[in-house]
């Protein structure tokens, strides 16, 4: 939503909300944004994406990864190596100069999250997310 004029907001809070609700909202928004990006990638490339491999600090959060799996309706895989981006760059460099082959490369899976909720449940939540984005975009 590359909209520089759009301001961040948290919608739907009640007087019963606490810091845990704020944290959950932040984590859910990360998953929704990932879905937006993956949907755009699928549309542009016409390639089906069947699983998501994650790394980095946020990948340590089980709630986030389960929510992503439910939202995307696909497995989300976390590996033992937390910084796969750097490792991937090293792998590509080694492959390009012939230091190793594809068969020699391997990364150990730590945990796989599979969808636990139905696409119907998650589609409703995603629809609400899209409404929230439009609301934020209209407030300038």
Question: Positions of the model-derived regions?
Answer:
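Glycine/Thr-rich phosphate-binding loops that ligate phosphate moieties of nucleotide
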Residues: 1-140
């Amino acid at each position: 939503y590359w909209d520089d004029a759009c301001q961040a907001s948290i919608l739907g809070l009640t007087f019963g909300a606490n810091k845990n609700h704020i944290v959950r909202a932040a984590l859910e928004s990360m998953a929704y944004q990932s879905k937006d990006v993956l949907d755009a990638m699928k549309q542009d490339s016409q390639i089906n994406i069947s699983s998501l491999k994650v790394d980095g600090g946020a990948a340590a959060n089980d709630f986030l990864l389960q929510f992503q799996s439910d939202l995307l309706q696909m497995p989300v895989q976390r590996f033992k190596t937390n910084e796969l981006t750097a490792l991937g760059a090293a792998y590509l460099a080694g492959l390009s100069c012939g230091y190793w082959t594809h068969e020699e490369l391997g990364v150990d899976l730590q945990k796989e999250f599979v969808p636990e909720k139905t696409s119907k449940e998650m589609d409703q939540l995603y629809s609400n997310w899209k409404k929230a984005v439009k609301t934020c975009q209209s407030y300038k």
